[in-house]
Design a protein with these regions (language model features):
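Conserved N-terminal segment of class I S-adenosyl-L-methionine
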Residues: 1-149, 153-157, 168-170, 268, ...
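C-terminal helical/coil "lid" or tail adjacent to the Rossmann-like core of SAM-dependent
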Residues: 236-276
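Residues lining the SAM
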Residues: 157-160, 186
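A structural helix-start
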Residues: 163-167, 187
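A short glycine-rich, Lys/Arg-flanked "PGG" loop and its adjoining helix->strand segment in the class I
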Residues: 167-182
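Short, glycine-/aromatic-enriched active-site segment of Class I SAM-dependent methyltransferases
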Residues: 65-67, 183-217
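Conserved S-adenosyl-L-methionine
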Residues: 221-231
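Short conserved AdoMet
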Residues: 89, 109-110, 164, 178, ...
Length: 306
C-alpha cells in the first residue's frame, strides 16, 4: 500500500520534470548496491520500501529550488562545504543526507567528490534529477537500511535542527559511519536568534557551537574542526526576524516571495562587502581557523576508533 501511494505521488510529480543544468564535471554513477540492497529503482531514482514523516514544509524543496542557484546564502554555504570536504576527506564517497534538491550534491560533484543524495521528499529527488545527478535515493537514511559501519562520509546540512531527538539521531549517524569516518554538519546558530521563521521552517532548535560539539562528543565523535559561518548575519536576523517575532509583528507572507527577497543577489557596495566577507570566511576554513560569530554553525567530526 505504501509503495502504491509513493508511486502515485512520483508519477504525478514526475510529469512536471524538465531537462536541468549541465555539470562542470560529469557525474559518475556509484554502485549503491555495494551499500544497501533494500531499495527499488524507478526512472533513475532509488526508493525505500516505506516512508516516514519528516519535520519540513511540504513545499520547501520546490520553494528553494527556484532560488538556490542565485542565492548568496546557498552559494556561500556550498563553497564552505566544498572547502572543508576537500581539506578533510576528498577521496571518499560522500552521502548527503536530507540533501533536498541536490544543490550541495551538485557542488560536491562539480569539485570531483563522488556524492550520493539521500532525500525523503519526492519533489526534491525529482529536482535533483533535473540537475543531472545520478546517485539519488528517495528515503530517510533509516528506511534505506544501510548496514552499521558502512558509510565513509556523511553530510547533514541544515538537517539536525529538524530532528526532535537530535542526540539519538547523532548516535545513529555514528553507528552508520565506518571507523574513522567523517560527518559534516551545518545548523542555524544561537537560540537568541529564534523567530517565527524557525517555526515555519520546522526547526526544533538553534545551536551554540559548543552545545553541538558537546552532543557530538557524547555520540562518540571527536571534533576535527568547528566554526561559525555567515559572520555578518546575526545582527540583521535579530533586527528583522527575532525582534518582530517577539513583538508580535511577524506577518506570514507568501513563502516564495519571502524567500526570494531574502536570498536575492546583492548589488553594488553591498555585494562587494559581502564578497570580501565570504572570501575571508573561506580562507579561514581553508587554513583551519575559527570564526567567533555567525548565523550558522559548521562542524567536521570524526568517528573515533573503538
Amino acid at each position: 500500500m505504501e509503495e502504491t501511494i509513493l508511486q502515485t505521488e512520483f508519477d504525478s510529480v514526475s510529469r512536471q520534470t524538465e531537462v536541468g543544468h549541465s555539470f562542470k564535471r560529469k557525474t559518475q554513477t556509484i554502485d549503491i548496491e555495494g551499500y544497501t540492497t533494500e531499495l527499488v529503482e524507478r526512472d533513475g531514482i532509488l526508493f525505500a520500501k516505506k516512508e516516514s514523516e519528516i519535520s519540513y514544509p511540504k513545499d520547501g524543496n520546490e520553494t528553494f529550488f527556484k532560488i538556490e542557484e542565485s542565492s548568496f546564502w546557498f552559494n556561500h554555504r556550498n563553497n564552505c562545504i566544498v572547502e572543508a570536504v576537500k581539506k578533510y576527506c576528498p577521496n571518499n564517497h560522500f552521502f548527503d543526507i536530507g540533501g533536498g534538491n541536490g544543490f550541495v550534491t551538485k557542488g560536491l560533484e562539480e569539485n570531483g567528490i563522488q556524492t550520493v543524495l539521500i532525500e525523503p521528499g519526492v519533489q526534491g529527488c525529482l529536482n535533483a534529477k533535473k540537475r543531472n545527478l545520478k546517485n539519488i535515493i528517495c528515503s530517510t537514511f533509516e528506511n534505506a537500511s544501510f548496514p552499521n559501519n558502512s558509510i565513509p562520509t556523511i553530510g547533514l546540512f541544515d538537517v539536525v535542527e529538524h530532528i526532535e531527538n537530535d542526540s539519538d539521531f547523532l548516535k545513529s549517524i555514528h553507528t552508520l559511519l565506518k571507523e574513522d569516518g567523517h560527518v559534516f554538519i551545518t545548523v542555524p546558530a544561537f537560540k537568541s536568534l529564534w523567530s517565527n521563521e524557525d517555526v515555519d521552517a520546522g526547526h526544533y532548535r538553534r545551536y551554540k557551537l559548543k552545545d553541538l560539539e558537546h552532543k557530538l562528543k557524547n555520540a562518540g565523535f571527536t571534533i576535527e574542526y568547528s566554526t561559525y559561518i555567515f559572520s555578518i548575519l546575526p545582527a540583521p536576523v535579530f533586527l528583522f526576524r527575532t525582534i518582530p517575532s517577539k513583538l508580535g509583528l511577524y506577518k506570514k507572507s507568501n513563502g516564495n516571495d519571502k524567500h526570494k527577497n531574502a536570498h536575492k543577489p546583492k548589488k553594488g557596495i553591498i555585494a562587494r562587502v559581502l564578497n570580501r566577507i565570504w572570501k575571508f570566511e573561506l580562507n579561514r576554513i581553508r587554513i583551519g581557523k575559527k570564526m567567533p560569530l555567525g548565523g550558522s554553525c559548521f562542524v567536521v567530526a570524526r568517528k573515533k576508533w573503538a
